[in-house]
Design a protein with these regions (language model features):
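Short coil/turn linker and secondary-structure boundary residues
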Residues: 1-4, 127
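Phosphate-binding site of ATP-dependent enzymes
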Residues: 3-75, 80, 96, 101-102
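ATP-dependent carboxylate activation and anion-phosphoryl transfer catalytic cores
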Residues: 64-139
C-alpha cells in the first residue's frame, strides 16, 4: 500500500529472482491433471477460496454458459500440461476473469494432504487419493 514499501519489495524480489505478476480479479480455480500427453485426464475444477468443487452458478446464471466456461477451464489446464510436457500429474492454477481463463501457475508436485486441492479434486472425481498414489508409484 505504501509506495516506498512497494519499491523496496520489488528491489528485494530482483535480488532473489522472485516473480511478480499482475493481480487478476476473478474466480480462482485449481485443476488437477492425471496422466501424460493426449492420454491425460482433467479432474473437476476446485474453487480455491472454498476448497470445494467449482459451483456452476458462480460461473454464470445460465447452466449452458456455466458448462461452457467449465469446459474452457478444463481445456486450458489440459493444454498447459501438454505444452509444458508435464508427466503423470500436476495441479494447474487458473483464474476465470469473467471473459477468459488466465493461467496463474502450475504445481508439478502438489500437496496430496487431506483437504488439499488435489485430494479434493480426486474425491470429487470419485477417486481415492490412496488409489491415485498407488497408481503413480507403479508408473
Amino acid at each position: 500500500q505504501d509506495s516506498k514499501e512497494f519499491k523496496d519489495a520489488l528491489k528485494a524480489c530482483e535480488k532473489t529472482g522472485c516473480l511478480v505478476r499482475q493481480w487478476v480479479e476473478g474466480i480462482r480455480v485449481s485443476v488437477a491433471v492425471l496422466g501424460t500427453g493426449w492420454d491425460a485426464h482433467v479432474l473437476p475444477p476446485i474453487d480455491e477460496t472454498k476448497n470445494a468443487p467449482v459451483s456452476l452458478v458462480a460461473l454464470s446464471s445460465s447452466d449452458e454458459v456455466a458448462q461452457a466456461i467449465r469446459s474452457e477451464i478444463e481445456r486450458c489446464a489440459f493444454e498447459v500440461c501438454l505444452a509444458l510436457g508435464l508427466r503423470d500429474f500436476a495441479l494447474v492454477r487458473l483464474v476465470w476473469d469473467g471473459a477468459q481463463v488466465r493461467m496463474a501457475e502450475v504445481e508439478t508436485l502438489p500437496s496430496f494432504a487431506e483437504g488439499s486441492a488435489f485430494e479434493v479434486a480426486c474425491k470429487t472425481a470419485g477417486l481415492s487419493i490412496e488409489g491415485v498414489l498407488n497408481h503413480l508409484v507403479e508408473l
